[in-house]
Amino acid sequence: MKLRFLTIIAALMVLAPLEVDAQRGHIRPSHPHIGDRYTFFRGIGVTFGYVNSQYYTQDKATDDRISSDLMNGFTIGLTKDFALLPHALYFQTGLNYIYQNDSRNENIKIPLTDMSVRIVGDREEHHLGIPLRLKYDVHILDNIGLTFDAGPTLLMGLSSKYLYKTRLSEGMVTSVDYNLYNGKVKSNGNQSGDFNLEQWMDDKGMYPKGRLGRFDVMLGASVGAHFFHILEVRLGYDYGLLNRYRNDVADMYSMHRGQFTLSAGKRF
């Protein structure tokens, strides 16, 4: 139901400016440089960039706040601008794919033994985002302009997992796959011998206090520059408005996501 609701909102916000733009008849300005800017913002944008994000968990009773390890990754997507005020104000939407990862690689000494094990693990996340932004353009020089945008991005999580494995001895490999959305754990190998990988992950606080929701509404802003009516670079920050915890845990704790993005794009 929630997915249908978000899809309807996105569709309405995309179609509304499209209809307004169509009614204007695509009138091109007479000034040559302004005309180039008009063409630039009417094109389809292909963007690729670096993403750095972090989760913030807060205890509602004590206000204690814990920040997760930083996650790095990339984003790739398509954008489209629709003119609201000619050559100045635009509505931007599109579809972005976001991948991020936090790797861990360390040696652990097994208590009461002379043995040590090497643990290799990742936290991986995949998201889809639909930006719904207002974008303002400032003309600086003939071939250079600045843009400022702000607004929400509808975010849907495709996957969020911990993937850890270790080798206790030759031929004895254990692994744990934990799904943060449904709370399911898949274990392979011996988890009850000298070293229990699943218990180690629990002791390290890797399992969240409850399952996480897939959906978020990220509110943010960015500043950018475009060059020669073709290339565009942007730097922005977004913060999640929804508590990612679900069910009863959401009454005691809140988890929100912050994200920096540095991207470059080209319009066609």
Identify the function of each model-found stretch.
Residues G73-T79, Y90, G129-R133, G220, ...:
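Membrane-embedded beta-strand positions in outer-membrane beta-barrel channels/transporters
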Residues L84, A88, I130, L134-L231, ...:
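Outer-membrane beta-barrel transmembrane domain signature
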Residues F41-T57, D63-R118:
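Glycine- and aromatic-enriched membrane insertion/assembly motifs of diderm outer-membrane
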Residues Y38, S68-G73, D122-H127, K209-D216, ...:
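Short sequence motifs at beta-strands and strand-loop junctions characteristic
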Residues N52-K60, Y99-N107, D122, I140, ...:
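Gram-negative outer-membrane beta-barrel proteins
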Residues H31-P32, K60-S67, D114-G121, M206-K209, ...:
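Extracellular loop and loop/strand-boundary signature of outer-membrane beta-barrel proteins
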Residues H256-F268:
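Outer-membrane beta-barrel "beta-signal"
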Residues A22-T75, G145, M172, V176-D177, ...:
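Short glycine/proline- and aromatic-enriched beta-strand/turn motifs that initiate or cap beta-hairpins
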